[in-house]
Amino acid sequence: MSYELLLSPMKIGSMTVKNRTVMTAAEFSLGQTDGTPTQKLMDYYEERAIGGVGMITPGICRVNDMGAASTFTQLSMSRDYHIAPMHEFAERIHRHGAKLCIQLHHPGRQGYSSSTNLLPMLIPIVKRFPKVLDMLFKCTPFLLGMEEKGIIWSVQAPSKCELANHGAMRVHAMSRREVKNLINDYIAAAERCKKAGVDAVELHGGHGYMIQQFLSPNTNKRTDEYGGSFENRMRFVAEIIDGIRDRCGKDYPLIVRLTADEMYDRIGMPGKGYGLETGKRIAMRLEELGVDAINVTSACYDAYNYWLEPTSFEPGWRKYLAKEIKSVVSIPVIAANVMRTPEQAERQLQEGCQDFVASARSFICDPHWVKKAEEGRENEIRRCIGCLNCIRSFMTNAKVGKQGECALNMSVGREKAYFAQERDGEDRTAVVIGAGPAGLTAAQTLARRGFTVDVYEKAEKAGGQVISAASCHLKDKLYWCIEDLMTGARNDGARIHLGSEMTAAQIAETKPDVVIVATGGQPLRPQSIPGINNDNVCLATDIINGHKKIENSRVVVVGSGITGLEVTEFLNDWGCNVTVIEMAPEVAPGAWFQLVDDEMERIKPFGTKFMTSTKLTGIEEKTVLTENAKTGEKGSIPADAVVLSLGVRPVNGLVKELAELGISAVAVGDAGSSGTIADACHSAYDAVMNIK
């Protein structure tokens, strides 16, 4: 396909970007406490520049050290000592023809008081005693517990307002002096960016952060000149823009990332915050103020799934927002619209939805997708499946001193080593049993190391349990990972044999140097429970895979994990009256909250009943017997059918059989320990890289 617009240059103010692609900011905790870029951070972004992106906006960059921190390891432009390291970073991006844009950020009410208040003290201490940070991360559970109880520091917000869904438990209204100081912090940070050779700055006015908090009537209840009317709510960002223009000049490219619609109506709160019409009005005012481009986004932490979408959201679903903003401004419009393929990107440019296509997750998943599109190698692009592991891992790992990671791209945060992989496996052979995500990741990693690799999958179709997952409502994109892992493994030299089951004896005959067992898991059906094998009992996978259909019946689903919620969707569609029981005290224990919210949004309209802290003790012909996990109280639920969704147990008997023949094998993925697609891929990669 010809990418006439996607690969064409375009100007943002005085800056010419070589193509229409922008990597948007996504924090990954690759920095360090003092806010200077690490080699690892620069390697990470330079690889995206090598891969052809037009402009890179690294993760959020704090504008001061007292109040503006979101993590202990993000970028900062709060001090003059940041200028020289940032200059080095910019030079590395410029080597490959890309532009560097720094996003200036303050979390406001969506910050965590431990990071915003401890950081000033930590910076000088950690410089002298680096291990102090490790000690702090060990205290994270205690600090978060204190924060949840609201008994430690508060964070800044435009006014005393309700708490965000995720963030601090105490906020305080900024004084007028604090507002003025923060405006000056933004301006000074922008000036340092210009001195460092950064090509552009972006003010983060989206996703519910500080600038948006001033713009929104939901969070701005001030009665002075910074609150009340539309013009007053615009004053905070207007004074920042005026100050940047005064210090950096009118030709220095300035972008605002703008939430065009706070999306409260999507989460059942119509009338709260502001909608698209106000978003358009803000955009027009920003153009009047001299902004060079608007980067259109949506929502805030309260409506998390409407800016960090799970896989159920259609690629491009947000393009109407960009098109509406573009209809009222003449400056370039950048937009991230769940962009997943170059074909989609070109199409949205041709439709006039936007001038630049933006994405963070697509560049996280495949740093070279632009170059691959340019060279006609689209089939080699590793597409983001929207599993949200990058978000989950960052938000979880940042609290304990670790980096974020991608479910499918093993190079994240180790680019130098990954792309300089030594082919130390040549003249050695490897057999991989199973072609799910773990088996295919193992195969590609082995092939990249130079092994001669054969993958054997007994089914006629690769994918393992991903086949079931991709069969669920709006989850078909999950199968992309199998298609792309297959392509990657084959391109690196692995041979994949479908419909080929191998016994231990047959494997032994090939005399492999390495054996990887990726035979997946089997759904649990605890035989200790009376009635577990009754005719009215089936497994969740029986329904998801189309082997069984239950209509217009009373059904009890046992287990409220993501699979349990997915099977509930099927049953609701088939007219069933569903009760979900869960032994844990909450629904979907351990599952990432966005995935749970996504499922529950589709389940709630059907009136499904959830019973937590409830153990299954027996199954009769028309009754499910239960026990309260807290009180021991016995109970019963009328039921025509029971669906079990209790997780999986590893299927790895082949490891023992091979051991009896004197062959060592490593179990990966669900064959080693049940988990997510990300768990499967990373366990396989780590296992292969540990082979000497």
Question: What function would you assign to each model-found segment?
Answer:
Residues 424-455, 497-511, 519-593, 627-641, ...:
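Rossmann-like dinucleotide/flavin-binding elements
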Residues 452-492, 569-614, 672:
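Rossmann-like dinucleotide-binding cores of NAD(P)H-dependent redox enzymes
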Residues 368, 373-385, 500-522:
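Small-residue-rich anion-binding loops in enzyme active sites
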Residues 241, 415-425, 430, 441, ...:
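Flanking helices and flexible, charged tails adjoining ferredoxin-like Fe-S electron-transfer domains
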Residues 1-433, 437, 442-448, 453, ...:
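Flavin-dependent oxidoreductase catalytic cores
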Residues 329, 352-353, 492, 533, ...:
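Short, structured coil segments at secondary-structure junctions
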